[in-house]
Amino acid sequence: MINRKHLSQNIAFGLFRLLSLSVVGILFAILGFIIYKGVGVIDWEFLTSAPTDGMTSGGILPAIVGTFCLMAGSALFAFPVGVMSGIYMNEYAPKGWVVRFIRIMTNNLSGIPSIVFGLFGMALFVNYMDFGDSILAGSLTLGLLSLPLVIRTTEEALKAIPDSLREGSRALGATKLQTIWHVILPMGMPNIITGLILALGRVSGETAPILFTCAAYFLPQ
């Protein structure tokens, strides 16, 4: 009986290892194919020049600069707003239907297609607020797109911190704000940063919001 259990356990572990190695192998195969096919055409001129001949040749410098600007702008918007929202929901908001409703709405926002955010950003930032097709409009739109993930990650990171640390800090005379700033946030910050990186990784690959709010193919002269 024991040998049978060990056998089934070893088979299960072997399958898990095989599946894990298969996933890693596929990932490395894709990366290897991309590097093999691209190493011959990627050079310094390709990375530092603008596209030419109707986007059929030239370089990708505007795309690189635009991506970094959009990521920085969206992080500047999503990080403080998302972290403060997560702190409020976990540390200050009374437990009740209001918080549950906000959580449901936040989860629903995470599932909205990016094209909806793009249309919303075009209507609000580009047209109504008259930002035009700009980095600012695109950054705010991508910030809204990444906001639900940052909020949920912040809330879950703060939930994982034991209440004994909060109680110990308060027992030493610290205020609630001091406890959050000096005890809770430093402990939860690694997970919060991880959530922000995941959110930025998601929005960096979105095309619909960029197309509707800030699509540009050349750097300003």
Q: Which ranges hold each PLM region?
A:
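Glycine/proline-centered hinge or cleavage motifs at structural transition points of membrane proteins
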Residues: 113, 172-173, 186
